[in-house]
Amino acid sequence: MEAETGSTMETGKGTNRGIRIALALFIGGTLVLGTLLFLVSQGLLSFQAKQEYCLKPECIEAAAAIMSKVNLSVDPCENFFRFACDGWISNNPIPEDMPSYGVYPWLRHNVDLKLKALLEKSVSRRRDTEAVQKAKILYSSCMNEKAIEKADAKPLLHILRHSPFRWPVLEANIGPEGVWSERKFSLLQTLATFRGQYSNSVFIRLYVSPDDKASNEHILKLDQATLSLAVREDFLDNTTEAKSYRDALYKFMVDTAVLLGANSSRAEHDMKSVLRLEIKIAEIMIPHENRTSEAMYNKMNISELSAMIPQFDWLGYIKKVIDTRLYPHLKDIGPSENVVVRVPQYFKDLFRILGAERKKTIANYLVWRMVYSRIPNLSRRFQYRWLEFSRVIQGTTTLLPQWDKCVNFIESALPYVVGKMFVNVHFQEDKKEMMEELIEGVRWAFIDMLEKENEWMDAGTKRKAQEKARAVLAKVGYPEFIMNDTYVNEDLKAIKFSESDYFGNVLQTRKYLAQSDFFWLRKAVPKTEWFTNPTTVNAFYSASTNQIRFPAGELQKPFFWGTEYPRSLSYGAIGVIVGHEFTHGFDNNGRKYDKNGNLDPWWSVESEEKFKEKTKCMINQYSNYYWKKAGLNVKGKRTLGENIADNGGLREAFRAYRKWINDRRQGVEEPLLPGITFTNNQLFFLSYAHVRCNSYRPEAAREQVQIGAHSPPQFRVNGAISNFEEFQKAFNCPRNSTMNRGADSCRLW
């Protein structure tokens, strides 16, 4: 996975941020382009003798894009990230409604603008498929702010008046039918209804995915769920920041309950108990560093699970979650059904805690989590109260524009419908051909380095690594099935949206989402298919299918440059991303899966020990990076997989680029860009850095370090290039420079 993101919530306020950003980019780009065009037309550029220059409009555009991002006053050998990105960051301040901002969010915003234009078109019964009509109606209902304001909290209060959603803190304040009864409270019924009807996983996460050791089969899995705060440590630590986050959460819970009709003193009392319970849950959660693939693979049948943790009716829970009206073939789920219990100790501790807790506190917590998830769908008074909470935990000061919130919601609710709408207009099929070139170049580079430069892996393990590399399956653009209108229409046939009932529409999508993964239970894993949303601005590796995936949303400038632009730009940007995803198959987790996607020990003991020894170098390197904005050091162990992928991907893409020069241009360098003095190798590294230009608010920086899988962007860039001798050659970095680690350089692949 490539992108870094800050925490966001679906809230909205109409602003002209998109227009301001577009206008600033247009003016800035026009000025730079105009200057370069004038210099070229007047012959005022000082070209090197006998050096070929590209003067096509695309090359002038590329030169302008590069110059708008760099800061030439910074020494690239001391801080390459600042050299490459300072210009972009200074010209693109973080929007007030975002916790961080960078080239990834910038491209995401541009995709959202395109989706907005598509969804705002009037419904055509003749031209639009049934699924597209539903997407447009859903968007229209989300944009119907007048109806949302008129409804206010009524749709949510309607739910809270019915079992199992009655919220004890509200007492009788929303009517006698809303009074919670301890005698009637059922933990199983509440958890199952939340998961089966609203896709809310509280305490327990139940889902279907491939069996790690039999990857052709789907299996039920049980895991720990999330918390109200993104960072588990914020419930446990006594730092100033953690305390302020807990205080903000507590006040938010109290105020939300009061907005829904609770008595203030009752809300303050009850929510203190709720917070104490959530702290207890945070204490027993399995931390990231202990969540290894081997540790989380605990396969057993439901009968064995019930014997291990008898305090909960696991079979009853699973049967209540799954809607057998949709999946009648699952009616026979019984004690012999296999499940993978990813966190047995967590579940043992969970039911010990719940067994000693007051039912009222448990009910208050469960319903709070449901209410919290629905706040984005309520009126402005709830949105503004959430914004006060967000100011503390994210640093944002305004709400997202309503259209942006709505686009994000529709995209997540109906990904394949929106995906088809997008690719029909904005995806060029010839991109697949160039992506195949990049992918095969990276595959060759990985295998070539494995054969010629890897001296620590024994022959048998190396042979199996080559087999896995050759077996990696690439998916580009979009899944073919989204073009089948009959299939997509049939998939959504039970959904009936109303333009005047946004909240009701949301509940329908939640039910659809809640039941969707159970479709796969008892079915074989389609190893050649993929199910990624085409509008996603990110890329992925799937260990269970040994696939690398590049959705259409990612394949745009400045990630993917077409054939009219220098190849150095594409190889440095999307090429490194291809290498990054490819290398995930051989990182500290991906390496445990064989070429068929099975969790299988295919490494020799000797090679595995040498791999682990070499990872220590990278763990130490990144752990020594201190991020002043976050006030924390990078977690080198937590980010190890992504750091391995960054370093390997950079080497593979550069090697593939040089092979392309040798094969396609007989070793002759590409024409240079006009008006700038960068060589093609330098452009490669600049393009690598440019897609990672990003800035953060302190709150988002702290969260990125605490729970992010990636190192912060500046350390992703500087960390990888400082380990790579080809970068040091390209920029003539002396041995004692910061970007030249020399003998201290780390390398696995």
Curated annotation (Swiss-Prot):
Residues given in the record as Zn(2+) binding sites: 580, 584, 642
Keywords in alphabetical order: Biomineralization, Cell membrane, Disulfide bond, Glycoprotein, Hydrolase, Membrane, Metal-binding, Metalloprotease, Protease, Signal-anchor, Transmembrane, Transmembrane helix, Zinc
PROSITE patterns attached to this UniProt entry: NEPRILYSIN, ZINC_PROTEASE
Active site: 581, 646 (proton donor)
Cofactor-binding details, from the entry: Binds 1 zinc ion per subunit.
GO cellular component: endoplasmic reticulum; Golgi apparatus; perinuclear region of cytoplasm; plasma membrane
Topological category with respect to the lipid bilayer: Single-pass type II membrane protein
Glycosylation sites noted in the Swiss-Prot or TrEMBL record: 71, 238, 263, 290, 301, 377, 484, 736
Residue intervals annotated with topology Cytoplasmic: 1-20
Record keyword Transferase present: no
Enzyme class: hydrolase
EC number: 3.4.24.-
GO annotation terms (biological process): bone development; bone mineralization; cellular response to parathyroid hormone stimulus; cellular response to vitamin D; lung development; odontogenesis; organophosphate metabolic process; proteolysis
GO MF, any single term: metal ion binding
InterPro entries on file: MetalloPept_cat_dom_sf, Peptidase_M13, Peptidase_M13_C, Peptidase_M13_dom_2, Peptidase_M13_N
PTM annotation, UniProt: N-glycosylated.
Pfam families found in the cross-reference section: Peptidase_M13, Peptidase_M13_N
Cofactor(s) required, per the database record: Zn(2+)
Subcellular location: Cell membrane
Similarity remark: Belongs to the peptidase M13 family.
Assembly mode: Interacts with MEPE; the interaction is zinc-dependent (via ASARM motif).
The protein's name in its UniProt record: Phosphate-regulating neutral endopeptidase PHEX
Gene source species: Mus musculus
Gene transcribed to yield this protein: Phex
